[in-house]
Amino acid sequence: MEATAASTSLPDPGDFDRNVPRICGVCGDRATGFHFNAMTCEGCKGFFRRSMKRKALFTCPFNGDCRITKDNRRHCQACRLKRCIDIGMMKEFILTDEEVQRKREMILKRKEEEALKDSLRPKLSEEQQRIITTLLEAHHKTYDDTYSDFSQFRPPVRNSEDEGNRPLRSILTPSFSGNSSSSCSDHCTSSPDTMEPTSFSNQDLNEEDSDDPSVTLDLSQLSMLPHLADLVSYSIQKVIGFAKMIPGFRDLTPEDQIVLLKSSAIEVIMLRSNQSFTLDDDMSWTCGSPDYKYQVSDVTRAGHSLELIEPLIKFQVGLKKLNLHEEEHVLLMAICIVSPDRPGVQDAALVEAIQDRLSNTLQTYIRCRHPPPGSHLLYAKMIQKLADLRSLNEEHSKQYRCLSFQPESSMKLTPLLFEVFGNEIS
């Protein structure tokens, strides 16, 4: 009787390629797995079990070395059983009737427990799934990760070599006193805005005046202000586009929409910018080409002090380390925009109802889709980031007022910046 090579012990499951057909070691039929310590088909598995339970004694009618195949395996039970034993099948692996019953009961119990767990596990409702899908689509439509539009801004000018090559950690120090900010605050009081803002709801966002580049180059300490002013104006337009697609946002009055957009714009821009923020040594915002890699020194050249930049970098690092899913990121932006506690909101109840739907969706998503340990206290950490943004918004407002009240810097700003930040609500 011809023998085929077969293992008599349980192999490592990783040794088998799922795409390679497995062959029964007894008859050569397609094997379904390891049964009683050998690779066999269902037919030979059942034959061996029945034979062992009955303690059957078979006699070969021929010379005791019949070749067993799929077609003739029923012809000689003696040689078939001998073949089963030769390839390593063991009766010790056969369960008794009681053991079989216990195993069935355990399997049934496990299935019932899994079904109960599944029924108790939070699931996204159809409405919540629609909210997430809508926000993802809105974000993809309003955030270009190729940053191709940046070439349309006034060009970045980095002509201050003494700061340009300084590493981030030499600029951001725990002992920073913030003198530049305090000195600015000395002469930038909370006097009313001198510029009359245009109508926000009717403004053509694509028509913004640009200043003469020759004037920009004369003020090296503000060399990056024209470029970053255009960048922020561009980002505001994108935030507006995103907000309009938030489910429920268009149900608000135009007045409340404007209030929410004006008060949250810079916060959402800071949230959006986390996508391009890198945790390298220089901790920069990388937006495509080297020309659009923004470091701390670039922000200082736009007139901002470390009183804003230090907490901004800390915020960006903390947010990046949360490793948010894109779904969580867009929900956080929407929650940030639709905040009922913004000063000037008229229908706070409706705004709160919209925000509650978004918040509930975020919490359910985290429980359903964000595996531990990253999900631990994640919602609370995200809400804390919104509180951090309020502080950043307040500091940005102070520093923006300093810029807007100085003729040499205000002339670098855009009409949209004056409209959104020039008539500060918060």
UniProtKB/Swiss-Prot annotation:
Tissue expression as described in the entry: Mammary gland, expression increases during lactation. Also found in colon, expression is down-regulated at parturition.
Polar residues biased stretches: 192-204
GO biological process: cell differentiation; intracellular receptor signaling pathway; negative regulation of transcription by RNA polymerase II; positive regulation of transcription by RNA polymerase II; vitamin D receptor signaling pathway
Stretches assigned to the NR LBD domain: 127-422
GO MF, any single term: zinc ion binding
Keyword Transcription regulation: yes
Motif (9aaTAD): 415-423
Name of a matching Pfam family: Hormone_recep
Annotation: DNA-binding region: 21-96
Binding sites annotated in the UniProt record for Zn(2+) 1: C24, C27, C41, C44
Post-translational modification: Ubiquitinated by UBR5, leading to its degradation: UBR5 specifically recognizes and binds ligand-bound VDR when it is not associated with coactivators (NCOAs). In presence of NCOAs, the UBR5-degron is not accessible, preventing its ubiquitination and degradation.
Composition bias, Low complexity: 175-191
Cellular localization per UniProt: Nucleus; Cytoplasm
Main localization, broad class: nucleus
Disordered, as annotated region: 147-215
GO cellular component terms, semicolon-separated: cytoplasm; nucleus
Residues annotated to bind calcitriol: Y143, S235, R272, S276, H304, H396
Family: Belongs to the nuclear hormone receptor family. NR1 subfamily.
Entry note about domains: Composed of three domains: a modulating N-terminal domain, a DNA-binding domain and a C-terminal ligand-binding domain.
Main function: Nuclear receptor for calcitriol, the active form of vitamin D3 which mediates the action of this vitamin on cells. Enters the nucleus upon vitamin D3 binding where it forms heterodimers with the retinoid X receptor/RXR. The VDR-RXR heterodimers bind to specific response elements on DNA and activate the transcription of vitamin D3-responsive target genes. Plays a central role in calcium homeostasis. Also functions as a receptor for the secondary bile acid lithocholic acid (LCA) and its metabolites.
Subunit structure: Homodimer in the absence of bound vitamin D3. Heterodimer with RXRA after vitamin D3 binding. Interacts with MED1, NCOA1, NCOA2, NCOA3 and NCOA6 coactivators, leading to a strong increase of transcription of target genes. Interacts with the corepressor NCOR1. Interacts with SNW1. Interacts with IRX4, the interaction does not affect its transactivation activity. Interacts with CRY1. Interacts with CRY2 in a ligand-dependent manner.
Protein name: Vitamin D3 receptor
